[in-house]
Amino acid sequence: MGAAGNTGSSGDSRELMSAADVGRTISRIAHQIIEKTALDGPDGPRVVLLGIPTRGVTLADRLARNIGEYSGVEVGHGALDITLYRDDLMQKPPRPLEATSIPAGGIDDALVILVDDVLYSGRSVRSALDALRDVGRPRVVQLAVLVDRGHRELPLRADYVGKNVPTSRSESVHVLLAEHDGADGVVISR
């Protein structure tokens, strides 16, 4: 299935990242996490990756696999549902609740890395921070995203960014992952 077929756009779309690009980018982010957190060192922190549904969960799973493969350290990973913490509940159609899954050991005193596919206004991340507060008390919270498209409405930034993509507000960025869309890729559409 072609990447542009899943955008829901009027056909004006172009590929930003191929499947190979997505794979390399996830691998690079995994290496950056290992290096920045000293995860594979003798006093490395306990790291937990929490994906923001839907594609953030899949990215967190892939990052956890890569980190384990590259460092020999297994990291906990799960999902953090932000639905009830969103500030746009009344403006959008109802959404089903997703499952929140926290790995054994919880998140207290851990280095938690929130994982999302696209960083845009920052509102999803703010919702995730609110949800996280109800789950536990991490020592440090960081953010990893596959694509940062700018246009922040809140003073947030990602610690790990796969690709910075300057966009206009009229454009949409769609991350496609094989587990959901049949193939990996990133497309931009008007």
UniProtKB/Swiss-Prot annotation:
Assigned EC number: 2.4.2.9
EC class (word): transferase
Motif window: PRPP-binding: 112-124
UniProt GO BP: regulation of DNA-templated transcription
InterPro entries documented for this protein: PRibTrfase_dom (IPR000836), PRTase-like (IPR029057), PyrR (IPR023050), PyrR_bifunctional (IPR050137)
GO molecular function annotations of the record: uracil phosphoribosyltransferase activity
Reactions performed catalytically: UMP + diphosphate = 5-phospho-alpha-D-ribose 1-diphosphate + uracil
Keyword field: Glycosyltransferase, Transcription, Transcription regulation, Transferase
UniProt function note: Regulates the transcription of the pyrimidine nucleotide (pyr) operon in response to exogenous pyrimidines.
HAMAP family linked: PyrR (MF_01219)
Family: Belongs to the purine/pyrimidine phosphoribosyltransferase family. PyrR subfamily.
Name the record gives this protein: Bifunctional protein PyrR
Annotated organism of origin: Mycolicibacterium paratuberculosis (strain ATCC BAA-968 / K-10) (Mycobacterium paratuberculosis)
Record gene name: pyrR
